[in-house]
A protein has these predicted regions:
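A detector of single, family-specific signature residues
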Residues: 1-259
Length: 259
């Protein structure tokens, strides 16, 4: 039974909302429903993909929480460090922030040692010239930084622990995403969705996981309504409102497609 359809069919002029009244309305609605066949049993792959997508989104939310906490702590232990790299949450940026959680830790070591730390902070290729450039920038930031706490504060230790948690979460999420992509590639229409400009392999796997078996939709209109991007139009007399989408469908699927 479609919940929205049931709501329309059981609505009345008099508003009376109780659990007992709802059960009575649904019981009265039952005999009027047409007999339908059993719902198709989706293959295990769609269930697995959906659960993987939901877990991916949970981990992303947890990572966003960690990022917010890390940035707040950095403003107290090492203000300005977030300016060193364009991507403040890249692996190299997190590695540097984990090693140098306080400006005194930068100023107390030799320049060559600092360059070596930066050079070894990424698995990707980095030239020694670029590492030297980052080392000089880091020294300038450390000299201009005025932290709220000293290097022995608990906040320094807390920051380091949160960075370690975020790095582990990023590593685990990458492994889970690779497995999800491999699972989704078993479907014959994976490449069809992946061929759409702007949709990568991970997005393709997550879209399939959230929507399910796309072949069960008989038309694009049904798919649009399921996602909630079908058009909502309002016109009354000389009033013509701008068309909007209904947003009654799967909000997670909408986020994957347009977020």
């Amino acid at each position: 039974m479609n919940p929205l359809e049931a709501k329309f069919k059981t609505s009345a002029l008099r508003s009376w909302k109780t659990d007992q009244a709802d059960a009575h309305k649904l019981a009265c609605l039952g005999p009027t429903l047409k007999q339908t066949g059993n719902l198709p049993i989706h293959e295990l792959i769609f269930f697995e993909l959906r659960e993987r997508v939901r877990f991916h989104l949970e981990i992303e939310n947890e990572q966003n929480r960690l990022k917010f906490q890390i940035l707040e702590l950095l403003h107290q232990t090492f203000p300005g460090l977030e300016r060193l790299f364009s991507s403040r949450y890249s692996i190299i940026a997190l590695n540097i922030a984990e090693i140098f959680t306080h400006p005194d830790m930068v100023l107390d070591i030799d320049k060559d040692v600092l360059i070596t730390h930066i050079f070894n902070s990424t698995d990707k290729g980095m030239s020694m010239d670029k590492a030297t450039k980052y080392a000089l920038q880091l020294r300038v930031i450390a000299q201009e930084s005025y932290p709220n706490v000293d290097r022995h504060s608990f906040l320094v230790e807390k920051l380091r622990l949160l960075i370690q948690q975020l790095k582990q979460s990023i590593h685990h999420l990458k492994q889970l995403d690779d497995a999800m992509i491999q699972l989704a590639q078993q479907l014959d229409y994976f490449e069809n969705i992946h061929s759409i400009p702007g949709i990568g392999k991970l997005s393709t796997a997550m879209i399939i996981g959230e929507i399910g078996d796309i072949k069960r939709f008989k038309s694009n209109k049904q798919l649009n309504a399921f996602v909630g991007i079908d058009i909502k139009r309002y016109q009354s007399g000389h009033t013509h409102c701008r068309d909007t989408i209904n947003k009654r469908g799967n909000k997670k699927a909408r986020k994957l497609l347009f977020g």
